Structures are given as C-alpha cells and as structure tokens.
Design a protein with these regions (language model features):
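Membrane-interface alpha-helices at helix entry/exit sites of multi-pass transporters
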Residues: 82-87, 101-104, 113-130, 287-298
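Transmembrane alpha-helix interface/packing and boundary motifs in multi-pass membrane proteins
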Residues: 91-98, 254-274
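A generic structured-segment signal
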Residues: 81-84, 92-97, 104-108, 121, ...
Length: 335
C-alpha cells in the first residue's frame, strides 16, 4: 500500500507539473500574439519549417540531457533503465513551473522512491547535472560573448567567474560521495552508511571521476551549442530579418538561462530570463526592444514546447518497450 501511495503522489505531481507548464505555454503564446506586427515588433511572421527544425533540435537535446542524467544515476550506483529514467527526469523537469524551487527535485525523488529506487541518488545526480549545466552555461556565454556577458549579471564579469569557481568545487568526487551519504540519512534510506550505493546493493561505483566529469561537461557544452542553433532556427522562423548567428545566440541563451535559474522567486525563471535575453540582444546585437521581446517570448514558448515534446516522446518509447511498474528487483519482490 505504501508503494501505491508513493506512485499516486508521483502521478499527481506530474499532472500538476503538466498543468502549470501548459498554462505557461498558453500564456507565452498569447503574449507573443499580443506583441503584434511591424509597428510594435519590427515585423514577424511564421515559417513552419524553421520552427519545426528548432522544435526537433530542442526535443533531441532534452532527450540527450535526460540520458546523461540516467548515466550519472547509474554511475552513482543506481540500477535504472534508460527508458525508465529518461521520462522520469523529463517529467520532473516540468516541476520547475510550479511555484517554489523545490518541486523539480521533490518530484524526481518521489517518483524514484515510488518505483523502488534510491531517491537520494536521484536527487544528487540531478543536482550534479544541474551544476554542470550552470557551469557550462557560463562557459558558453563567456566563449560566445566575452566580457559582454557581464551585462546580464549587473555589469560585472567577476560575478559569473566566482560563481563558476564555487560550483566546480561542488563537483569534487569526495564532496559528491559525502553528499550522497548525507542525503541518504536525510531521506532515511539504507545507503547512509557509506558512499553512493554501499549498503543498498545498488552498486559501488561511486561518484564520477575527474575525466568523466570533463566528458559530461563537454557533452553539456555541445548541448548549449545545439540550443544556440535551435534558437537561431526560431529566430529565422519568426523574424522578417535574421539576427545574429548560432554561436552568439548560444551565449545569449545560456547567460539568460543562468540568470533566470538564479531567480529564486520566479518559477522556471519566468520574466527574469526574458528580461536578461532582451538586454543581451540589445547590448550584443543592437536588436530593438520590440524585436528582442518577440524573440525572448518565443524562446520561452519554444523551450516549454520542447520539454513537453521530449516528455511525450520518452513516454511513448517507454510504453512501446512495455515498461510497467517498479523495475528494481527488490521492489518487485524478485529473488
């Protein structure tokens, strides 16, 4: 009965996350329509082929990021199949749009525990991946924009440099192992007596090593590049006159994402991310405010559409593979 209630709670969270994400998507599209035509925004139109290309790139990118999280969870010792873990991460990711910054991780932990997995490993691997995303986002912005990235951080380049340094320290294997044990004790799991996986029978590989962390960082940096290409496709699909190039748009998108993520009072970085993007578009590419507003709001609509699309694809693949119920041997009662 306890497991059923946990599964019910995870399903309720997912439904709530989908509702909030859909609400933000509809509101974003309404805002985009309200920006009007040439007089207000400098002119915009819809080119389906470019928009579909951007949607495809963003969807594939998110599926790749979800697979990277599953790899991290397995590296920490959790036995989880990719076709189970990918939709779990993508579904929990939608929790960012629920007011309050804890729902993304709380939803992932509840789902994993409901499926008979370690919620502490799920949370720690998600946090580790998020740190990598933030660090590589700052690096992508620095590579593409140079000192101009400081415009999104109050005009100072020192702020993102110090932030990246502090985040990198948190990825040290020893810190990750101790964090796993602490989270396990906090969540009252059996793995509290050792590094990740020890005492649970889920594996003893432990935290990723330095070389593996570097590979994860390179993969995430490639994901930022794909986001830049995707945003360029969205711009080509909406604006009368093309702006920028994929590399510059990668830096603008990455910097605005980091700023939005750090906005603790804003679900999913709403408004804050768009404001940072409009500012950077104006500063770096001399884009008028009206055109920048169109692209910033379109980028939000695109991001949510990609999240919903990736989750839908992952769920279809999961059900096509016939994955039902807990996959952990102990949760199934297998010998």
């Amino acid at each position: 009965m306890g497991l059923r209630w946990k599964q019910f709670g995870a399903a309720a969270f997912l439904l709530l996350a989908l509702v909030f994400a859909a609400f933000v998507l509809v509101r974003g599209w309404s805002t985009l329509e309200g920006l009007g035509g040439p007089a207000e925004s400098g002119g915009w139109r819809v080119s389906p082929r470019w928009l579909l290309a951007g949607l495809g790139l963003g969807t594939a990118n998110l599926l790749g990021m979800a697979a990277l999280w599953v790899w991290l969870a397995r590296r920490f010792g959790e036995r989880i199949e990719y076709l189970e873990g990918i939709p779990a991460w993508l579904g929990a990711n939608l929790g960012r749009y629920i007011p309050g910054k804890v729902w993304q991780l709380a939803g992932l932990a509840a789902y994993m525990r409901g499926r008979g997995h370690s919620s502490s490993v799920a949370v720690l691997s998600a946090l580790a991946l998020q740190i990598v995303v933030l660090v590589t986002g700052l690096l992508a912005a620095a590579l593409a924009l140079g000192g101009r990235m400081g415009e999104a951080f109050g005009g100072s380049v020192l702020v993102p440099i110090l932030m990246a340094t502090g985040l990198l320290l948190l990825l040290h294997p020893a810190i990750l192992r101790r964090s796993t044990a602490w989270l396990a004790r906090l969540l009252r799991e059996d793995s509290a007596d050792g590094p990740a996986g020890e005492g649970t029978g889920r594996g003893r590989e432990g935290a990723p090593r330095g070389g593996e962390t570097l590979l994860i960082g390179l993969a995430t940096l490639a994901a930022w590049w794909l986001y830049g290409v995707g945003l360029w496709c969205i711009a080509a699909g909406l604006l009368e006159d093309p702006i920028g190039d994929p590399l510059t748009l990668m830096g603008i998108y990455a910097a605005s994402y980091v700023v939005g993520y750090l906005a603790l009072i804003s679900p999913g970085g709403l408004v804050v991310r768009e404001g940072a993007m409009i500012l950077l578009l104006a500063t770096v590419l001399s884009v008028p405010a009206g055109v920048g507003a169109v692209l910033a709001v379109a980028a939000r609509v695109w991001a949510i559409a990609c999240e919903l699309s990736a989750f839908g694809v992952a769920m279809l693949l999961r059900y096509a593979a016939g994955l039902e119920g807990p996959t952990d041997p102990e949760a199934k009662g297998a010998p």
